[in-house]
């Protein structure tokens, strides 16, 4: 069971585990004025890692085994495939021959799992916190599904921005599977960072990042998209409802060549059938273009004059206008 509690103008209580009337609950901030309470069956692990993050795995009554970082839900067994398939497959199916892929973040292994369904030759994954990988492999192994043992993986434990700043390699696709924009992670959602990523992309390639919920975190979403729009010649937004995120989640794409909604339908269906037929739980060619079909109010929101996320003025989670 999940209880949505709108608490305004009161200050939201601190997030985390709560014992209320003999019930173990998890309180999560879902926005600047919204919190959720979820029934907890069991706490599987809780660790303050060497990277300075609180990493928890919790068995939730509704969503099953779930990963929290700094009290924010990252993935659940119930619906992680919606997020990961939307992040990965529109991106890689837009490419004729995706040889090299870079994932920044992605320590839960879900994006890696989906990338490895494609005929890629090499995947570089740069994760800040090794403990995230170890925790998921131990407590939620269904998500990576053995992907960290794939010989095509080149795993780097380190700062994603520093890697991009010093990287001399080129990639067909760059997938930013990040924690939400708070703390040091805001540096991975700025115009300056996207400009550095752009230099790593081969001709014909593209970048994708999740860009927050389109309702509860509207301003954050707008500012991230604006930064991408001002960096790349081509840009697009997809959205998919992810129940555990309490919102329609946005995915922003940037390219100097082609973005997924511009992909020819015949090519899309052929590539899907050759690479992925029977291997997805959410994504299908029939919904590809629907993911990019935005209602009028969101199209209008993307045209509003908002400041792009920059190093000097980064977008942050739960930002308000």
From Swiss-Prot:
Molecular functions (GO terms): spermidine synthase activity; thermospermine synthase activity
Pathway: Amine and polyamine biosynthesis; spermidine biosynthesis; spermidine from putrescine: step 1/1
List of residues binding S-methyl-5'-thioadenosine: 53, 127, 159-160
Chief location bin: cytoplasm
Top enzyme category: transferase
Biological process terms in GO annotation: polyamine biosynthetic process; spermidine biosynthetic process
Active-site feature positions: 177 (proton acceptor)
EC number: 2.5.1.16
Compartments in which it is found: Cytoplasm
GO cellular component terms, semicolon-separated: cytoplasm
Residue ranges of every copy of the PABS domain listed in the record: 23-256
InterPro entries: PABS, PABS_CS, SAM-dependent_MTases_sf, Spermi_synthase
Reactions this protein catalyses: S-adenosyl 3-(methylsulfanyl)propylamine + putrescine = S-methyl-5'-thioadenosine + spermidine + H(+)
Keywords linked to the UniProt accession: Cytoplasm, Polyamine biosynthesis, Spermidine biosynthesis, Transferase
Binding site for spermidine: 84, 108
Keyword Transferase: yes
Functional summary from the UniProt entry: Catalyzes the irreversible transfer of a propylamine group from the amino donor S-adenosylmethioninamine (decarboxy-AdoMet) to putrescine (1,4-diaminobutane) to yield spermidine.
Family: Belongs to the spermidine/spermine synthase family.
Quaternary structure and partners: Homodimer or homotetramer.
Name of the protein described by the UniProt record: Polyamine aminopropyltransferase
Species for this entry: Korarchaeum cryptofilum (strain OPF8)
